[in-house]
Amino acid sequence: MENGTKNVEELTKNKGLLSPGGKALLKDNPDNYIKIRGARQNNLKNIDLDIPRDKLVVITGLSGSGKSSLAFDTIYAEGQRRYVESLSSYARMFLGVMDKPDFDTITGLSPAISIDQKSTSRNPRSTVATVTEVYDYLRLLFARVGVPHCPICHREVSKRSVEDIVNEVMKLPIGSKLMLLAPIVQQKKGEFLHISEQYLQKGFSRVRVDGVVYALDEFPTLEKQERHDIELVVDRFILNPELYSRISSSIEQALELGQGLIMLLKINDNSSTIEGKNLGKSNTEVLTYSQRYACPVHPDELIPELEPRLFSFNAPQGACPTCTGLGTRMEIDPNLVFNQNLTIAEGGIRPFNRVQSDSWWLKRLSAVAARHGFSIHVPIRELTEEQKHLILYGTGNEKYEIKISGSGKFKDGATYESIYEGVIPTLERRHKETDSDFMRKDIERFMRVHECQTCHGARLKPVVLAVTIHGLNINDFCNLDVDAMLDVLSQDLEFTEAEALIARPILKVIRERVKFMQDVGLGYLELSRAANTLSGGEAQRIRLATQIGSGLQGVLYVLDEPSIGLHQRDNDKLISTLRHLRDLRNTVLVVEHDEDTMMSADYLIDIGPGAGARGGQVISAGTPEEIANDSDSLTGKYLSGAKKIPVPKTRRKPKLNQYLTVVGARENNLKNLTVKFPLGVMTVVSGVSGSGKSTLVNEILANELLARLHRAQTVAGEHERIDGIDNLDKCIVIDQSPIGRTPRSNPATYTGVFTAIRELFATQPEAEIRGYKAGRFSFNVKGGRCETCQGDGVNKIEMHFLPDVYVTCPTCHGKRYNREALEVKYKGKDISDVLNMTIDEAVEFFENIPAIANKLKTIQEVGLGYIRLGQSATTFSGGEAQRIKIATELSRRSTGKTLYILDEPTTGLHTDDVNRLLKILDRLVAGGNTMIIIEHNLHVIKSADWIIDMGPEGGQHGGQIIAEGTPEEIAKNDQTPTGVYLREFLK
């Protein structure tokens, strides 16, 4: 039987083809389904599944159960592969060829678009406005209807045609005495001896120099070092309508001589002669006309033609020349240069702490110290600010005599003269001049990103920022948050009839795109926000808004937890957006754990029953109501309320009324807050998206504690001080970043258990006979690793215009080690066999070795018994990586004075995983430690001992503490959205 055509009895054997009610899905037109047969990618167990097309379909299940394997690695990957396969071989050369996922057949697929969290732009030039393409339309709008101004005096400037200028002149009072001038020199130094001869030959007779009119053959002698203004007298006339033709011809000639700029002097003097007279402000009125954009007061400020590229900070025409359009510059941070506790001689100047005591650099600094009255043998903290400034910025051209005990190019005992450049100028020069990437990166350790002092973060040239629409330049528009931008665009912007024809369609597109961003809960984001500062959830929702704006139909969208980082209040907006995408006749496939999203789905698929090797099966599929009634579905039990995360019976009290207090927090949108975090309890910082939670906890608290307690080179956000740090000895940030950056990293190496395993193998009789040490059992260094694949287990074969192919190493057959290392065994297993064990298997295998077993048990306890000891770090989800980190912390001895900081630890976790996570976090706090969690998940919020709720809105309308207290106290507070939603969860 082909294409899954089976009778009903056979269908009932695989619930993936059935709704929980038992009816086969094939009752409808087969074309209405994506039909998957025999999917075996990663841990999928040969599953068969029909997914309805043009519906909102949610895939859920435990972390590691195979949701992403089905949605992304199978369905999306195959949809994308087929689309790429349909292109020419020339196009595929640039796009690459995707591997075919492991399945029998898939029918009914559409071209697929993935909207995940891993594709966030890391380009510092990308902003919210550029990613959503709103900036492209803003550039077009400003280029077509923007009003240019002088960047110095800010007066409006315009350009006119010859006819416009002539008509303006003819409107002056009849009988006016006028002199038409063509500016040929404007505020330039020189004698300009050539002017007299050059223009006499062209038939001109008079010139105005610095306000005084001269005959050209009597051109004055000018001071070479002074700035001068020189205008050629093109014509003189008394205004009369009959002179229209002459005036028009003269103005045209003057515009050509003045390169588009002319001056018209309205003379108030009645005398007939003008030679030698100072025709300045007292007796004349100066009128300036231009064919180009030019300021009459500052004519040297050239304003180019308004084109879209002029408003791009990625193009040299518009980008700030100082920061090249980045808005920021890398600059040496004096705080990172000094180690205040050491003397200069001991290496207190970090960039030069490896120099020898008799080095040229140190001798020169000793000479500076001797002359300016300080010693290189006292701790830097004891030096005055003035002395530190000398060390950092040098002493100018002041020279010092330095005696050298000769070596190399220096003569022994010779005395040399030298200036002292200063630490910061020296590092800046070397950073600019060096061709060595190593040297540049080494210097960048002492640099920090600072706002560009030329454009002040606007990224554009002053002349570009002087172009406005209703008083706002393009940077002002981008500095608005999404909500404020919509308010501005909803106003009745006044344009001329011609401008309105141009602006109306552009504004319509901008308004739509910004509205879509508001609809996905991003109303607090400023359009100028750098894309690389967005969280995964924010970046994903921006891409979602962009896709809605594209208006595509008949597409398969695959999304990965779009509700991440979203407050419950904004969830309804997100669900409406997903439905809107579906209503455009698209299939929307969402991997999600949020209960509201699941209940809003047209179709729900539950993958399980466990994680890893114990998962990969379709447990239940059908409408949310059908899943809720399915006793086999773990998800269904939580949806129906049959299973719940219990509310804690008691709440912990702060440890002896001890608090960690942040005073005067002013970073980003924080409103000069003073916040008290109780010690010895679990505190959740909640609040709507963009309210300032991450700024307070990560940028200020975590960075300051890491710098103070661990000497990390982190710079805390703006605040006055933090009190109570002396009650802590460690600060550990447990986030969802990978546990390693290379495929060689794995749980065994990260947790440190691999060291104990290698040492165990080194004690085996065979290893001792051969003299093997623990290093012999490392796959990262020569000795025991296979040198054919250098310990990778696979060899990479470059396929040029095809993607690289990885082939199992023919020498070690994927075992990573050479034959000699594999001959050493423990309980019949070699080192490669151990790395291929799951955590569950390894716990049993090493049960008699506490140093190994105890660490592995903590990984087992966090629900990761299914992962393998040697599994590559790059294959773990964010939730799995975070739980490995938590397990590592659990295995360490608790001091009771540790602060743990977690940012949305429930990302990627099923409700049952959240239940398990809460029990583990409770164990960490039970040891007397303190935990601060940023979280939207109401199960975590209700389990907290203390809640700090921020708001009331996001962006500039946030940054305040709107409620503090126990979950029960917050739930009674009608002023906080968190409290309103929390009430249901406390019942």
Identify the role of each PLM range.
Residues 1-987:
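Conserved phosphate-binding elements of NTP-dependent enzyme cores
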